Amino acid sequence: MTMLNDPSKKYRAFPTIDLPDRTWPSKTIDAAPIWCSSDLRDGNQSLIEPMDSVKKLRFWKTLVSVGVKEIEASFPAASQTDFDFVRTLIEDGHIPDDTTIQVLTQAREDLIARTFESLRGAKKAIVHLYNATCPSFRRIVFNQDKAGVKEIAVNAAKLFVKYAAQQPETQWTFEYSPETFSATELEFAKEVCDAVIEVWNPTPENKVILNLPATVEVATPNIYADQIEWFGRHITRRDSVLISLHTHNDRGTGVAATELGLMAGADRVEGCLFGNGERTGNVDLVTVALNLYTQGINPELDFSDIDGVRKVVEECNQIPVHPRHPYVGDLVHTAFSGSHQDAIRKGFTQQKEGELWEVPYLPIDPADIGRSYEAVIRVNSQSGKGGIAYLLEQEYGISLPRRMQIEFSQVVQGETDRLGLEMTAEQIHALLRREYLQANTPYALISHRLQEENGNSAVDAEVHVDGETQHWRGKGKGALEALVAGLPVAVEIMDYNEHAIGSGTTAKAAAYIELRVNGDRAVHGVGIDENITTASFRALFSALNRSLSQAQAKAA
């Protein structure tokens, strides 16, 4: 079978919502929602190999450590393993006072009874009821009409009240999901939810949670936002209801749907860390939270060690995080492109402590989430001078002058083209040493003596030339001018720069020279030494030898 030329014969567009006075497009998100992690339930049930109790407890502790206050721990009636995990959390004191355990149940009395039994002794708990409400599920899965689906929800809601009353020591919160909400007729979804509300009788002080899932993502995010705004306008006792979002990523827009849903008035978000979950996954709580953070809003979740969180999630889920995953992927703070690297390098140079973050191409400061700057710039055949210069400066304290950056980038480009691979900072530094610092033929500086008198300098340089030692002597107004005067070839110094590498007794000097030999094209040299004069002399010999070697190669 192949794709259809006319897909309308098999698929139909989801209808739009009649909401001409919608207000959500002009709203902004100005505070964090209530967060609920479903990693241990929705996420766990989607794994090829579900977590054992050890992994579950490790994951639970990670969720608590980052600040998630509502955690859906399991489906206690589904298995003894899930039931026992809830008991472990309660009996072994793993639930902090500011954290609420949440569990899920279907609408059957035996399952509801078992679910409440699992929570015995909990200080507070959210019990989450669901049944599917959309036309296809009513017709295909349950063979029920609207009245039958509504009756299932109402009867189960009554059982919640019954079993909660038997454990008055627990502070109960009830949650109801019209599963497949986003594919359900809005009027009917409201009708069922209103009926559940009537049974549970919430108040502004003891609210119920109405969770409105995009169980399968079937439309664009704006339609989901319209559904949420319409629902918030029409649901009974809105002041006694928390509207919760539970989006999936079937169309790749789970985060967008969640953000627009919050703009449309939702109070709460259910999802999983890094977007684990059935099929294409639940909404990624980390992305939504850090999107808020980069808009200047405290997400009330702490991802200061995002790589530590990622390690736990990967090991427990046995699924790697994609290298391009927002905020946490290996490559999301990395630039290979030359123009990007140049912009980032300039941004870092100009970024001042305490000022608004404005580094190009980096929407978040990697340091805020515990990541180093080492991987921000990496060098391959697409890279330019900016990235190379940045790595040398950050890793080795070597600040190449601008024109030398251009020259050396061509050297690096030739090497990356030859290798066909990325080059590390260590490899780039080794290439710099080979190309410049070890350029010692035909002339190798062995030692020098410098005399200063009346503002003039006299140099006696001991040089190794073709197996013999020579002395080159010259005078000038400075050490470099004196050395140039003693050279056997005509040299014109065009530019000179120097700086310290490090500080204190271990500091070294770096010198950079741009010169012409016998009127030929300009070349650069580098010298590094504890003594600044020696460093400058080594830089001159580096450039001199490179120029002569290039001229010889050209002549050949």
From Swiss-Prot:
Q: State the pathway, as annotated in the record.
A: Amino-acid biosynthesis; L-leucine biosynthesis; L-leucine from 3-methyl-2-oxobutanoate: step 1/4
Q: Where is the Pyruvate carboxyltransferase domain?
A: 33-307
Keyword hit for Acetylation: no
State the Gene Ontology terms under molecular function.
2-isopropylmalate synthase activity; acetyl-CoA C-acetyltransferase activity; magnesium ion binding
Superkingdom per UniProt = Bacteria
InterPro entries per the record? 2-isopropylmalate_synth_dimer, AIPM/Hcit_synth_CS, Aldolase_TIM, IPM_Synthase, LeuA-like_post-cat, LeuA_allosteric_dom_sf, LeuA_N_DRE-TIM, PYR_CT
Tell me where in or outside the cell this protein is found: Cytoplasm
Q: Which UniProt keywords apply?
A: Amino-acid biosynthesis, Branched-chain amino acid biosynthesis, Cytoplasm, Leucine biosynthesis, Magnesium, Metal-binding, Transferase
Query: Which reactions is this enzyme annotated as catalysing?
Result: 3-methyl-2-oxobutanoate + acetyl-CoA + H2O = (2S)-2-isopropylmalate + CoA + H(+)
Q: Which GO terms describe its cellular component?
A: cytoplasm
Q: What is its EC number?
A: 2.3.3.13
Q: Where is this region: Regulatory domain?
A: 439-556
Name the positions where Mg(2+) binds.
D42, H246, H248, N282
A Pfam entry, by short name: IPMS_D2
Q: Which family does it belong to?
A: Belongs to the alpha-IPM synthase/homocitrate synthase family. LeuA type 2 subfamily.
* Quaternary context: Homodimer.
Purpose: Catalyzes the condensation of the acetyl group of acetyl-CoA with 3-methyl-2-oxobutanoate (2-ketoisovalerate) to form 3-carboxy-3-hydroxy-4-methylpentanoate (2-isopropylmalate).
Q: What is this protein called?
A: 2-isopropylmalate synthase
Specify the species.
Answer: Pseudomonas syringae pv. tomato (strain ATCC BAA-871 / DC3000)
